[in-house]
Amino acid sequence: MKRVLLVVLAGVGLSGPASAQWLGMPVWNSPKGGTGITISGDYGKPNADWGKGNAFGARGTLGLGSLSATLGFASWNPSGTLPTAKSVGGDATFRVIGGSLLPININLLVGGARATATGVPGTTTIVAGGGASLTLPTPGVSLEPYVSLANRWHSASGSTNSNFGWTIGANLGFGGVMGAHIAYDSESLGSGSTGGILGVGLHLSLKVPLGM
């Protein structure tokens, strides 16, 4: 098991590093988008095929309506004696359908990050895909369930592999600046293995004037 997980961390062989660009985290998404600044705190729990352990991260998102840009980091500590993997990266999303007048939202997503861990090569991950969500009119709470489909390319030591994955999740707002998010991410690793990550978190949404 330790050898397999080292291969995962190195991003070579049959699988890539855990989850999306931030190791140990789902591919977070919000097809609806928005305006202002959102600060998110995240927790990820990979399954056995990903090496278990715990991941913690933080993200900052600038929303400009249809376009959103995010920067963030995560620290994933796999089970056993494997080294902690730290990743820094970002993503950008563009809403192509939806907005305040439509309950259905569709967006495109592209992201990337660089991950490092002691004793293994650094890994670069690129994610590209899109998602769809519904804006549900729930009293006192904003609810956005979504599904995302994305390909994930993982490159380390001159070797690149490609995996397909999907994410189901929901973003919740509680009528003010506070909100929550939850997602489950699944990635096909080949040889009958499927990596799964459950992620949860809280976020603060600041509707600041952006002069646009």
Set out the residue ranges of the language-model regions.
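Sec-dependent N-terminal signal peptides
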Residues: 4-14
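Outer-membrane beta-barrel transmembrane domain signature
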Residues: 49-50, 111-212
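Short connector loops at helix/strand junctions that flank enzyme active sites
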Residues: 53-55, 66, 85-89, 103-105, ...
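Surface-exposed loop and membrane-interface regions of Gram-negative outer-membrane beta-barrel proteins
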Residues: 69-101
